[in-house]
Each structure stands twice: as structure tokens, then as C-alpha cells.
């Protein structure tokens, strides 16, 4: 007796669902003004999560840890302590 051993392959690709394909929108964190740049009061200087950079002179800290200028002046990024950084705004010399 003759036996045929046939193998049939799918003619259509099986379509399954995927668990990938999502990502959250970037939050655009980081420096918004450069060292030595002139800013007006209320300008956002640095957006961050937590206190990566601390507020210095004439700089406030928002509820989401955003640093902003309290007065018009020049931005200065500085180091303080051994491993900390702060940003200050100094009034323009007149």
C-alpha cells in the first residue's frame, strides 16, 4: 500500500495581537536657559524631576521642582558643596 505524507503550509499569515507599540510622551526636561543668558522674572530656567539642581539667589522652585527666575537678570549655573549644583539669577549691573 502506498502512503502519502503531505505537509500543508499556511497560505495566509496568522495575525495576532501585539503587547508592544505604546510609549509615553517625552516631558522635555532639562535646561531652558543657558549660563550667562539674560532672563526676565518668571522665566523657566530648568525643568526637572526632584532636585537635580537647587535654586540659588533670586530663583524659585515650583510644585513640580521647576526652577524659575524671580527677577530680571543674568543666569549663572554654579557648584556648591562637593557634588551639588545650583542656578542663580543676578541683577544686571546698571
Swiss-Prot record:
Source taxon at top rank: Bacteria
GO BP annotation list: translation
Instruction: Share the record's PTM remark.
Output: The N-terminus is cleaved by ribosomal processing cysteine protease Prp.
List each coiled-coil range. Answer: none
The record's listing under PROSITE patterns reads: RIBOSOMAL_L27 (PS00831)
Q: Name one GO cellular component term.
A: cytosolic large ribosomal subunit
Which residues are trimmed away as propeptide when the chain matures? Answer: 1-9
Q: Which GO terms describe its molecular function?
A: structural constituent of ribosome
Going by the UniProt record, its keywords in alphabetical order are: Ribonucleoprotein, Ribosomal protein
Concerning PANTHER family, the annotation shows:
LARGE RIBOSOMAL SUBUNIT PROTEIN BL27M, RIBOSOMAL PROTEIN L27
Enumerate the NCBIfam families for this protein. L27 (TIGR00062)
Question: Which family does this protein fall into?
Answer: Belongs to the bacterial ribosomal protein bL27 family.
The entry's protein name is Large ribosomal subunit protein bL27
The species is Bacillus pumilus (strain SAFR-032)
The coding gene here is: rpmA
Amino acid at each position: 500500500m502506498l502512503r502519502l505524507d503531505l505537509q500543508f503550509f499556511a497560505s495566509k499569515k496568522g495575525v495576532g495581537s501585539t503587547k508592544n507599540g505604546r510609549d509615553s510622551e517625552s516631558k522635555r526636561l532639562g535646561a531652558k536657559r543657558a549660563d550667562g543668558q539674560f532672563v526676565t522674572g518668571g522665566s523657566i530656567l530648568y525643568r526637572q524631576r526632584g532636585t537635580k539642581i537647587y535654586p540659588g539667589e533670586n530663583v524659585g522652585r515650583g510644585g513640580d521642582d521647576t526652577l524659575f527666575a524671580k527677577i530680571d537678570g543674568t543666569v549663572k549655573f554654579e557648584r556648591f558643596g562637593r557634588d551639588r549644583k545650583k542656578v542663580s539669577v543676578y541683577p544686571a549691573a546698571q
